Regions:
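Residue-level signature of the cytosolic catalytic core of signaling kinases
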Residues: 57, 61, 195-196, 264, ...
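Short, flexible, glycine-rich and Lys/Arg-enriched loop motifs at helix boundaries
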Residues: 38, 178-198, 209-230
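Short-chain dehydrogenase/reductase
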Residues: 97, 145-153, 189, 193-197, ...
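N-terminal Rossmann-like NAD(P)+-binding domain of SDR-like oxidoreductases, especially those catalyzing
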Residues: 1-182
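C-terminal substrate-binding subdomain of Rossmann-fold SDR/epimerase-dehydratase oxidoreductases
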Residues: 202-346
């Protein structure tokens, strides 16, 4: 039996494929490579010494997707594929509803047709909106503030309705916080385009000289140093969280929602100083105006994942920094050969 990974060539998807292969799962990948690169999958095979089956397919193409289920004995699906830029979603919401929500409907329709009813869904902590208290538990009220987050919430609700209609489905919804770092080999990592939206690739691109300085958005928040605090989690810990959720999903018929985070927040300047300490480099920065909608502090309560999945984040901030820098140093131009720019794989 095989595990189908949608968006498996993306940042989180490729790291999860490594952990699946290391756990002796057979892996089948569907990816349209609109914001990922087949080279990532070549390197996954290089790291693990195992082969993976890859289909270059858009999830909206149900006929092609059916072929994947016809040609493979699929036991469960881990669903990463989707657009992920908050700013872009505000400018082009219809694109996000099509590529995130409609594509998931297409996927679930085909899954149901072929009686594959185990799915792990890659959601996001963006569904929580502005927290009133901390840490953030899974029972927090949902308050999405942009079309990207809205697609995640709508998919979560849709999956709940699917389960209510047919309790033979088993569904795990993973809400994770801020993945950073890279595989310790330095062969795969976050291959961002232009000026990154995320902190760590921004830092590494400044450190390597591709960008002039780091923009720190706001230094007057009510935090220890005035900069925003987030829950940063090593991407390999996050990948292992997906494997843990997969095991439970296959064993149980239920809907489970889990935060994946470290349970500790670090400020922007704390991450910057940790990176400088781990690499013996100095990263120039300037303070800019806060971004609209940003909150001061945001971190997870991951107790449920520990109790029910037996999962806990293990890697330190220092390891996250060292691994991210190793990836950037070994791959200054990312995976080099990009087919086209978009945002469809995690």
């Amino acid at each position: 039996m095989a595990i189908l990974v949608t968006g498996g060539a993306g940042y989180i998807g490729s790291h999860t494929c490594i952990e699946l292969l290391n756990a002796d799962y057979e892996v089948v990948i569907v990816d349209n490579f609109s914001n990922s690169n087949p080279i990532a999958l070549q390197r996954v095979q290089q790291i693990t010494g195992k082969t993976i089956k890859v289909y270059e397919i858009d999830l909206l193409n149900e006929l092609e997707l059916e072929r994947v289920f016809q040609e493979n004995s699929i036991e469960a699906v881990i669903h990463f594929a989707g657009l992920k830029a908050v700013g872009e979603s505000v400018v082009n919401p219809l694109l996000y509803f099509e590529k995130n929500l409609i594509s998931t409907i297409s996927l679930c329709t085909v899954m149901q047709k072929y009686n594959v009813k185990n799915i792990v869904f890659s959601s996001s902590a963006t569904v929580y909106g502005l927290p009133e208290t901390l840490p953030i538990t899974e029972d927090f009220p949902l308050e999405v503030r942009n079309p990207y987050g809205r697609t995640k919430r709508m998919i979560e609700e849709m999956l709940h309705d699917v389960y209510i209609s047919d309790s033979s489905w088993s569904i795990s919804i993973l809400r994770y916080f801020n993945p950073i770092g890279a595989h310790e080999s330095g062969l795969i990592g976050e291959d961002s385009i232009g000026i990154p939206n995320n902190l760590m690739p921004y830092i590494t691109k400044v450190a390597i000289g591709e960008l002039k300085e780091l923009n720190v958005f706001g230094n007057t928040y009510e935090t220890s140093d005035g900069t925003g605090v987030r829950d940063y989690i090593h991407v390999c810990d996050l990948a292992n969280g997906h494997v843990a959720a997969l095991k439970k999903t296959i064993e149980m018929n239920e809907v489970g929602i889990f935060n994946l985070g470290t349970g500790r927040g670090y400020s922007v300047l704390e991450v910057l100083r940790a990176f400088e300490s781990a690499t013996s480099l100095t990263v120039p920065y300037k303070v800019c105006d806060p971004r609209p909608g940003d909150v001061a502090i945001y971190y997870a309560d991951a107790t449920r994942a520990f109790k029910e999945l037996g999962w806990k984040a293990k890697k330190s901030l220092e390891e996250m920094c060292k691994d991210a820098w190793r990836w950037q140093l070994n791959n200054p131009n990312g995976y080099l050969k990009r087919k086209k720019q978009s945002t469809s794989s995690k």
